[in-house]
């Protein structure tokens, strides 16, 4: 019975919309085995809300592996223990399907390599920015090339620490994407493209200050501002308290601050800014995770 540990992920990192993602040191665990009948057991985050039938995203992902390798599907038992908050912008759905894909691949003897796992996970998730770092770890830049996803992984600079402020309310990716415009100004597109390029160079050279300066965005965060009460105030509070950069984590509502080493004032400042807008949140300090999903 494979036990798979899958990291949380934060996507976009400011300018890298649907392109950049990073693994974080917070994990979901999934056990998977063949069974006489389908069974899904869920504990932890989402225990009372995540579907337990065969429509469950992890169960569907497991069956997709059988189809991918040309094997007839068999009933499966999945035991999921979730520590990643659901629908908060920390890659909970990516973790579920990646855990199932990696675990099923292990059951079948490992016929799929990392690139094939990323491609299958992207097909199921719809975009690679969470699933790629969940599989590969570190910071991953991804691009679609026809039917293929091209990924390159970077080790994260030592000394980087993140602080996440996780509001108690959920925000679905569907709603968060629904507020985005179909077209953007050329000037805004160039603004983001240039910053993604320099951001990746900063990561590669370990320049945390430059990395922080480049984590700004004009393509998605301004449009999502009305969906998250206090977002602008939380950004400002985190920077004032010592963060190098602050961005939305994925499509939100979680806000993530990037810091040089531990900055004990950042988390309380973010929580206080949310509280002033009537939003309760949980604050966690999370190290970047340089490994992806692992079979234990």
UniProtKB/Swiss-Prot annotation:
The keyword Isomerase is assigned to this record: no
GO cellular component: cytoplasm
Pathway recorded for this protein: Amino-acid biosynthesis; L-threonine biosynthesis; L-threonine from L-aspartate: step 4/5
Biological process, per Gene Ontology: threonine biosynthetic process
Compartment list: Cytoplasm
Transport keyword on record: no
Residues the record lists as binding ATP: 85-95
EC number from the UniProt entry: 2.7.1.39
Matching Pfam families: GHMP_kinases_C, GHMP_kinases_N
InterPro entries, A to Z: GHMP_kinase_C_dom, GHMP_kinase_C_sf, GHMP_kinase_N_dom, GHMP_knse_ATP-bd_CS, Homoserine_kinase, Ribosomal_Su5_D2-typ_SF, Ribsml_uS5_D2-typ_fold_subgr
Stored SUPFAM superfamilies: GHMP Kinase, C-terminal domain, Ribosomal protein S5 domain 2-like
Coiled-coil residues: none
GO molecular-function term, one example from the UniProt record: ATP binding
Keywords annotated in UniProt: Amino-acid biosynthesis, ATP-binding, Cytoplasm, Kinase, Nucleotide-binding, Threonine biosynthesis, Transferase
Record field: catalytic activity: L-homoserine + ATP = O-phospho-L-homoserine + ADP + H(+)
Family of the protein in this entry: Belongs to the GHMP kinase family. Homoserine kinase subfamily.
Role played: Catalyzes the ATP-dependent phosphorylation of L-homoserine to L-homoserine phosphate.
HAMAP family given in the database record: Homoser_kinase (MF_00384)
The name this protein goes by in its record: Homoserine kinase
């Amino acid at each position: 019975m494979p036990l798979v540990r899958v990291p949380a992920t934060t996507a976009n990192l400011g300018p890298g919309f649907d392109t950049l993602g990073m693994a974080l040191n917070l994990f979901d665990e999934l056990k998977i085995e063949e069974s006489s009948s389908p069974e899904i057991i869920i504990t932890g985050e989402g225990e009372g809300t995540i579907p337990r039938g065969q429509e469950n995203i992890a169960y569907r992902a497991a069956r997709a592996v059988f189809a991918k390798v040309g094997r007839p599907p068999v009933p499966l038992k999945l035991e999921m223990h979730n520590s990643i908050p659901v629908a908060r912008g920390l890659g909970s759905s990516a973790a579920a399907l990646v855990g199932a894909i990696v675990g099923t691949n292990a059951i079948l003897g490992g016929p799929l390599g990392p690139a094939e796992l990323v491609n299958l996970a992207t097909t199921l998730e719809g975009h690679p920015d969470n699933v790629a770092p969940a599989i590969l770890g570190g910071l991953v830049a991804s691009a679609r090339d026809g039917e293929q996803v091209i990924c390159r992984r970077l080790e994260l600079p030592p000394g980087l620490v993140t602080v996440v402020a996780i509001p108690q309310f959920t925000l679905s990716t569907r709603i968060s994407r629904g507020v985005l415009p179909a077209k953007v100004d050329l000037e805004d597109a160039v603004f983001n493209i240039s910053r993604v390029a320099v951001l990746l160079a900063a990561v590669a050279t370990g320049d945390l200050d430059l990395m922080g300066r480049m984590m700004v965005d004009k393509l998605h965060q301004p449009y999502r501002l009305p969906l998250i009460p206090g977002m602008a105030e939380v950004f400002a509070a985190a920077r004032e308290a010592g963060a190098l950069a602050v961005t939305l984590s994925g499509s939100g509502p979680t806000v993530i601050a990037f810091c040089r080493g531990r900055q004990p004032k950042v988390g309380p400042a973010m929580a206080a800014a949310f509280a002033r807008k009537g939003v309760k949140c949980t604050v966690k300090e999370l190290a970047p995770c340089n490994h992806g999903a692992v079979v234990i």
